[in-house]
């Protein structure tokens, strides 16, 4: 039980420290996106790519928001990596998606990326 109690305490502490204003701001962005028929592009690498792919399903099915993820099309993504390089694969995929002003980009990242250390440079 000690582990479970510790887990619950730590989870509560994290939840208590979430910025409610920022969460509300994100909700407002998503509500406006749906109202204006914008598209949501969700990016992630590693585990974040799996979360991005699953989030596309939830936003489409539950929220009625047109959503896309570059890692859902492995053929296109790997062709871009092969032809253009990993560092520009996502930005070029986004360019090919013809983003417009009413669209949004959501990025799942654990480390946030770092150009100097070459960590998740394709999402920076």
Where are these regions (language model features)?
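Generic N-terminal amphipathic, Lys/Arg-enriched alpha-helix
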Residues: 1-18
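Short amphipathic alpha-helical segments, especially helix-boundary/capping motifs
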Residues: 2-7, 33, 66-68
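A short alpha-helix capping/helix-coil boundary motif
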Residues: 7-10, 35, 101-103
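A short, well-structured juxtamembrane/interface segment
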Residues: 18-36
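Residue-level recognition of short, well-ordered coil/turn positions
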Residues: 37-38, 64
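Short glycine-rich phosphate-binding loop at a beta-alpha junction
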Residues: 39-43
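Glycine-rich phosphate-binding loops that contact phosphosugars or nucleotide phosphates
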Residues: 45-124
């Amino acid at each position: 039980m000690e582990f479970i109690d510790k887990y619950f305490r730590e989870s509560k502490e994290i939840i208590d420290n979430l910025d409610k204003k920022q969460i509300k701001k994100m909700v407002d962005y998503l509500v406006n996106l749906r109202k204006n028929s914008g598209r949501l592009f969700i990016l992630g690498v590693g585990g974040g790519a799996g979360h991005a792919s699953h989030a596309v399903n939830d936003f489409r099915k539950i929220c009625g928001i047109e959503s896309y993820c570059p890692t859902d099309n492995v053929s296109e993504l790997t062709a871009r990596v092969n032809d253009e390089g990993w560092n520009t694969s996502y930005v070029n995929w986004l360019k090919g998606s013809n983003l417009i002003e009413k669209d949004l980009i959501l990025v799942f990242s654990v480390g946030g990326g770092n150009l100097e250390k070459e960590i998740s440079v394709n999402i920076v």
